[in-house]
Amino acid sequence: MSRIEPHAIPPELLLKAYRAGIFPMADSRDDPEVFWVEPKMRAILPLEGFHLSRSLARTLRRGKFTVTCNAAFEAVIDACAAPRPGAEESWISARIRESYIGLHEHGHAHSIECWHNGRLVGGLYGVGFARVFCGESMFSREPDASKVALAWLVASLRKVGAELLDCQFTTPHLASLGAVEIPQSQYLQLLSKAQRPYSSGELAAARALADAVGDGLGIGGAGVVKGDAAALGLPAGFAALRAEGAGSSSPGNVIAQSLTHTS
């Protein structure tokens, strides 16, 4: 772990760190400094191993929550940093907050939000690149809200061919949903594999997906540049799933069906 000066981490440096398997944290909400973390053991959630319980499947199908992507990134990170019962402090400092907002503006940090009656009641945010998504934090103000956000995340990542969902540290909550712990050395191998160059077929598929959902993202197939088929990443997968569920009374039906096939 090494200390750096107290100002927002440049997006290029932050993304480079994630590509190398390390990430920043702060000691407290008011800490002006950050330290770089490379855990000896790493939690990941295998995308084909998400545990979809019957109760969560019912919640998805009922459509209790309205789910969005990148609609309220700052509100999500603020909710994740807010004091909670039994956890008054947070590693999400002002510096961490500004750093991830900057990365979001550069297209590599994303959020998923759960709304109920117009109120933000759950969500998560993280960092996306290549075939990788690194989950940073989640919050829930109503039962199952964060689980629904995670279910949409997993289904969306699978839709765009992602291979690695990094959870950083394991918790009982994440373990109940399928997260497992592996040595950092094994994680780095998976990380390297997930960043391999894209094949012409993968680039073509990404362009086709961009054309299909481009209106919702403000882009088209031409926006998929050489070398980064995942430039669209989570938002494209999310938009595609929303489009598939457009004719349903509950878009969550699509998510439940998708995850039931492998859960």
Curated annotation (Swiss-Prot):
InterPro entries: Acyl_CoA_acyltransferase, Leu/Phe-tRNA_Trfase, Leu/Phe-tRNA_Trfase_C, Leu/Phe-tRNA_Trfase_N. GO terms for cellular component: cytoplasm. GO terms for biological process: protein catabolic process. Its main location: cytoplasm. The keyword Magnesium does not apply. Keywords: Acyltransferase, Cytoplasm, Transferase. It is found in: Cytoplasm. It comes from the Bacteria. It is an enzyme of class 2 (transferase). Disulfide bonds: none annotated. It catalyses: N-terminal L-lysyl-[protein] + L-leucyl-tRNA(Leu) = N-terminal L-leucyl-L-lysyl-[protein] + tRNA(Leu) + H(+); N-terminal L-arginyl-[protein] + L-leucyl-tRNA(Leu) = N-terminal L-leucyl-L-arginyl-[protein] + tRNA(Leu) + H(+); L-phenylalanyl-tRNA(Phe) + an N-terminal L-alpha-aminoacyl-[protein] = an N-terminal L-phenylalanyl-L-alpha-aminoacyl-[protein] + tRNA(Phe). GO terms for molecular function: leucyl-tRNA--protein transferase activity. Its EC number is 2.3.2.6. Functions in the N-end rule pathway of protein degradation where it conjugates Leu, Phe and, less efficiently, Met from aminoacyl-tRNAs to the N-termini of proteins containing an N-terminal arginine or lysine. PANTHER family: LEUCYL/PHENYLALANYL-TRNA--PROTEIN TRANSFERASE (PTHR30098), LEUCYL_PHENYLALANYL-TRNA--PROTEIN TRANSFERASE (PTHR30098:SF2). Belongs to the L/F-transferase family. This is Leucyl/phenylalanyl-tRNA--protein transferase. The gene is aat.
